[in-house]
């Protein structure tokens, strides 16, 4: 039975049996057989239990490693297409975490790291694949941009800052960080500027590749605690990067030409040459599927760096159909996100099929892939999202092809079933 503050037990002042506060100092006293507990102590007990559950749950999760089939199924929920890349990633990630579970090698056989290199055009889903895997496995995830990295001692971001970012994501818990995933984007931008090693120092190209070598392969990185600056008297956090999965991604623009040059060597010229017609020409995506390590060396990555990324997955360019699917099918599809926003205003949002096709066509024209879809939808809905909170009785907003093309405003359907075209201010 709960005792409200101010209600005495026969005029007697009551106190919490745990913290000793009187009924006048708390909002609620709950009575038991000859004991009382206040609302503050109940809340404190709840917090303690919640913290203990959080500490136990990661250990329980570790016992259950999703199979490659399960990982692939999770990726299918969020990422459209890229079937071959999903399969490659699912197997590589499964093997990596299996290696961590069985740290003591049998018969002296040490398992190597399965770091991954993703090659694919902008907006094809490289980052999303890595991010989704980290979310499924409930491990810390961080992203780094290779273009901002420089060798230690030069102006720019030190490669060890990547590990610091990962630690920040898990409140500087080293054990958690060592099970994390790091995605390094724009890795193609740190390619060597020419095939021949230069006399001058290439601090943002080959120099960064050299600096990343040890980090990706596995080393003990010394990171200052809580993001402080390094100084000699400081105690560092020691992070073993051999347990961290590194995924590197890049568009590698022009790599298809390198592959074609290799493939066409020895085809001959003159009367004996084999003439290729239009039907024999391959798309860039098809050509990239034939990539070999030697092509990446020719492109500008050093052999040692390529050797640290043994798993190679190629992503294809997204066509109109794939972009339409991305707009509406995944669990967190863009149209579903905006529909949820409109639902908060008690308004239904509908995208007609012709609108989805027009949005996909716009993204293809901009050559931004899936990455550009959100900004297009934001632009289409800007005026209506501005006006809607101040407009009464709107039950539904309909977006069709003409709205996407800017030829008309969204159709508003009011609660009394009247349809009206919105007028943009």
Swiss-Prot record:
ClpX-type ZB domain mapped to chain residues: 4-57
Gene Ontology cellular-component terms for this entry are: HslUV protease complex
| Molecular-function GO term, any one | unfolded protein binding
Amino acids binding ATP? 121-128
**Known Gene3D superfamilies for this protein?**
1.10.8.60, ClpX chaperone, C4-type zinc finger domain (6.20.220.10), P-loop containing nucleotide triphosphate hydrolases (3.40.50.300)
| InterPro entries (alphabetical) | AAA+_ATPase (IPR003593), ATP-dep_Clp_protease_ClpX (IPR050052), ATPase_AAA_core (IPR003959), Clp_ATPase_C (IPR019489), Clp_protease_ATP-bd_su_ClpX (IPR004487), ClpX_bact (IPR046425), P-loop_NTPase (IPR027417), Znf_CppX_C4 (IPR010603)
Q: CDD domains from the entry? A: RecA-like_ClpX
One Pfam family of this chain = AAA_2
**Which SUPFAM superfamilies is this protein grouped with?**
Glucocorticoid receptor-like (DNA-binding domain), P-loop containing nucleoside triphosphate hydrolases
Q: Which NCBIfam families match?
A: clpX, PRK05342.1
Q: Which family does it belong to?
A: Belongs to the ClpX chaperone family.
Name of the protein: ATP-dependent Clp protease ATP-binding subunit ClpX
């Amino acid at each position: 039975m709960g005792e409200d503050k101010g209600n005495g037990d026969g005029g007697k002042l009551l106190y919490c049996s745990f913290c000793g506060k009187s009924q006048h100092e708390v909002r609620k006293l709950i009575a038991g057989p000859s004991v009382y507990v206040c609302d503050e102590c109940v809340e404190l007990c709840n917090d303690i239990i919640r913290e203990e559950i959080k500490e136990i749950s990661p250990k329980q999760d570790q016992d259950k490693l999703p199979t490659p089939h399960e990982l692939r199924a999770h990726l299918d929920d969020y990422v459209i297409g890229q079937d071959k890349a999903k399969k490659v990633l699912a197997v590589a990630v499964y093997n990596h975490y299996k290696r961590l579970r069985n740290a003591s090698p049998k018969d002296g056989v040490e398992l190597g790291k399965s770091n991954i290199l993703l090659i694919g055009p902008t907006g094809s889903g490289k980052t999303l694949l890595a991010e989704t895997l980290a979310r499924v496995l409930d491990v810390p995830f961080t992203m780094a941009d290779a273009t901002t990295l420089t060798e230690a001692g030069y102006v720019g971001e030190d490669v060890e800052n990547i590990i610091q970012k990962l630690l920040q994501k898990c409140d500087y818990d080293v054990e958690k960080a060592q099970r994390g995933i790091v995605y390094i984007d724009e890795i193609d931008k740190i390619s060597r500027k020419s095939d021949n090693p230069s006399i001058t120092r290439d601090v943002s190209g080959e120099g960064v590749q050299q600096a990343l070598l040890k980090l990706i392969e596995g080393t003990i990185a010394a990171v200052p605690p809580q993001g402080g600056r390094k100084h000699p008297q400081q105690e560092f956090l020691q992070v073993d990067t051999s347990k961290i999965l590194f995924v590197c991604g890049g568009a590698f623009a022009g790599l298809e030409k390198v592959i074609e040059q290799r493939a066409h060597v020895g085809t001959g010229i003159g009367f004996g040459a084999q003439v290729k017609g239009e039907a024999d020409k391959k798309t860039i995506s098809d050509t990239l599927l034939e990539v070999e390590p030697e092509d990446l060396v020719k492109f500008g990555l050093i052999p040692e760096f390529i050797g640290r990324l043994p798993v190679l997955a190629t992503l294809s360019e997204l066509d109109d159909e794939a972009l339409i699917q991305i707009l509406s099918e995944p669990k967190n599809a863009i149209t579903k996100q905006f529909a949820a926003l409109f639902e908060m205003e008690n308004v239904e949002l509908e995208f007609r099929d012709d609108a989805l096709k027009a949005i996909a066509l716009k993204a293809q024209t901009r050559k931004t892939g899936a990455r550009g879809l959100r900004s297009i939808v934001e632009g289409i809905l800007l005026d209506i999202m501005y006006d809607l909170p101040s407009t009464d009785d709107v039950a539904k907003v309909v977006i069709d092809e003409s709205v996407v093309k800017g030829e008309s405003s969204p159709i508003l359907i009011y609660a009394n079933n009247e349809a009206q075209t919105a007028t943009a201010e």
